Regions:
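Active-site capping/gating regions of soluble enzymes
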Residues: 1-68
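C-terminal non-catalytic alpha-helical accessory regions
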Residues: 61-69, 73-180
Length: 180
């Protein structure tokens, strides 16, 4: 079951299936790739999002954790060096969901770059703020699916493609248009 009920949006509630289905083993599916979070063009550290999920759905109620990674042909497989931190965070939280996002970010930075506090501390702060920064401009006012046609890099609430499926258009979900 996907962690949220929509489709790996920058912010969405956890899927109600996790608490509604009591007698069925479940596995959560997280999206490690940054499809709706700027692909690999933006720093979007996802551990805080996954920690939010585990605050509502106890890890011991799950049988497994899966991740959609979508590696590419880039030298580092991820496109952006900081996208690798999400792979690391996914593995660490799958193994031990009680770890904090900050602990994981610090571990990854020290193992990847340097142990120097002058680097680790400010970059960890950037990582910890990154997902909220992406949410703020990808989902202004909490509105989701505002993405441009043909890519998910940024908002395009005015998008209207003749003949396209209505549920693929930004205004379908929130009914906002140029008049309000």
């Amino acid at each position: 079951t996907k962690n949220g009920p929509v489709d790996f949006q920058p912010r969405e509630p956890y899927s109600p299936l996790f608490t509604a289905i009591e007698h069925t083993d479940q596995m959560v599916e997280f999206q490690v790739t940054q499809e709706y979070l700027g692909h690999s063009n933006h720093i979007a550290y996802l551990a805080p999002m996954w920690k939010e999920f585990f605050e509502f759905v106890p890890a011991n109620s799950l049988k497994a954790v899966a991740g959609v990674a979508n590696i590419g042909t880039d030298v580092n497989w991820c496109g952006h060096p900081f996208a690798q931190s999400n792979w690391y965070a996914f593995g660490r939280l799958a193994w031990n969901p009680s770890l904090s996002s900050e602990e994981i970010a610090e571990e990854w930075l020290k193992q990847t770059f340097t142990t120097e506090a002058a680097f680790v501390n400010p970059v960890k702060d950037i990582m910890m703020d990154s997902r909220e920064a992406v949410v703020d401009y990808m989902m202004p006012m909490g509105l989701h699916h505002l993405f441009a046609w043909g890519h998910h890099y940024g908002p395009e609430p005015w998008c209207a493609i003749p003949g396209a499926r209505p549920d693929w258009m930004p205004s379908y979900y929130h009914k906002a248009d140029k008049v309000g």
